[in-house]
């Protein structure tokens, strides 16, 4: 997605999925007559990216030089590429003959049209599932780790050889799923059409090392003008990443949400107390039907989700952002 492109906010307000917790059930939108379509989502491997930049793999190896460290790094890149290619072949072969199929690279997700009957298979690390989640509306997602053990496996928790079984049980509604809560930010009210959605977390702050100045309003009505390094609000999925890192760094006692909890955790980073700014309201929870409201009090603030700074929204003085648990959830096959 090019900077400045935004997802239509109308897509962010779908009826809530059933609260979830790991039990099987019918797949939303599944047609009784139309064969399911399996959409394989993947990203360009590091080797493919290097070849794209250097021309050939041999040229990349030549430019890296003869050193042992360089050779080990390239061997590791080559090994991961081979594992990914193998996993994609296994997943493709697992799709039943009568089913439809599609494939999309991560960089093309914003131009790909998912259908209600789709079963999405993401072949890659956890971050790939976070990337695809914001484009889905209840379609089940199977996370395949092409190189088991190389990542955390929080979302991409299945092996390639499990795909055939998972496709069958997912299509007929027998596969257990988790409805993972997502985070939504709406700018200047629902009617503006401006906002974003993320699986892990949403960040609001300055695009540089300067402080961000804003008015923070909590769900209970308390307010505080702050100058800080930014505000971070995340889901239970995000509570295993950046949100957890912030909590540990500040030795917070805040109980972070679980992945299926309909609530968010939030932190203010490095709030600066001064005669005109406070540092008392720096962490908390946002439960279902609640929100965290932030009004920009400085120019050139940015808003982005899941670390995707290229998809950031630029905020001007006076613009208001409302952050809350999204109605949409990620239906993760577990």
What are these model-predicted stretches?
Residues 3, 7-13:
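Short, basic, low-complexity termini and linkers enriched in Ser/Thr/Gly/Pro
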Residues 45-46, 125-128, 147, 236-240:
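Short glycine-rich anion-binding loops that position phosphate/pyrophosphate groups of nucleotides
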Residues 135-157:
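Short, acidic/small-residue loops that bind anionic groups at enzyme active sites
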Residues 118-119:
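Structural motif
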Residues 11, 15-18, 22-50:
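N-terminal, charge-rich interaction modules
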Residues 128-137, 243-248:
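Short Gly/Thr/Asp-enriched flexible loops that form oxyanion-binding sites at enzyme active sites
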Residues 122-123, 233:
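Redox-cofactor binding/interface segments in oxidoreductases and associated redox assembly factors
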Residues 28-44, 61, 71-74, 78-107, ...:
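Catalytic phosphate-donor-binding core of small-molecule kinases
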């Amino acid at each position: 997605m090019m900077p400045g492109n935004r997802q239509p906010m109308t897509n962010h307000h779908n009826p809530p999925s059933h609260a979830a917790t790991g039990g099987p059930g019918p797949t939303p939108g599944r047609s009784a007559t139309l064969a399911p379509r399996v959409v394989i989502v993947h990203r360009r491997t590091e080797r493919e990216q290097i070849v794209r930049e250097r021309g050939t793999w041999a040229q990349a190896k030549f430019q890296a030089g003869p050193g042992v460290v360089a050779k080990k790094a390239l061997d590791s890149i080559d090994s991961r590429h081979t594992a990914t290619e193998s996993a994609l072949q296994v997943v493709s072969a697992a799709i039943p003959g009568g089913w439809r199929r599609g494939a999309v690279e991560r960089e093309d997700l914003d131009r790909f049209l998912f259908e209600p009957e789709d079963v999405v298979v993401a072949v890659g690390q956890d971050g790939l599932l976070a990337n695809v989640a914001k484009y889905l509306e209840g379609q089940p997602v199977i996370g395949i780790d092409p190189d088991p053990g190389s990542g955390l496996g929080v979302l991409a928790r299945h092996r390639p050889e499990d795909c055939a079984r998972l496709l069958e049980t997912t299509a007929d509604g027998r596969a257990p799923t988790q409805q993972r809560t997502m985070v939504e930010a709406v700018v200047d009210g629902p009617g503006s059409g401006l906002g974003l959605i993320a699986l892990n977390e949403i960040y609001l702050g300055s695009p540089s090392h300067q402080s961000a100045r804003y008015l923070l309003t909590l769900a209970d009505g308390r307010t505080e003008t702050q100058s800080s390094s930014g505000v971070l609000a995340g889901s239970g999925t995000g509570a295993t990443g950046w949100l957890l890192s912030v909590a540990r760094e500040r030795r917070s006692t805040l109980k972070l949400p679980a992945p299926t909890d309909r609530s968010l955790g939030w932190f203010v980073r490095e709030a600066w107390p001064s005669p005109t700014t406070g540092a008392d309201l720096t962490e908390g929870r946002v439960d279902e039907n609640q929100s965290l409201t932030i009004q920009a009090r400085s120019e050139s603030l940015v808003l982005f989700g899941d670390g995707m700074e290229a998809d950031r929204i630029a905020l001007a003085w006076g613009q208001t952002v409302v952050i809350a648990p999204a109605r949409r959830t990620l239906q993760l096959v577990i």
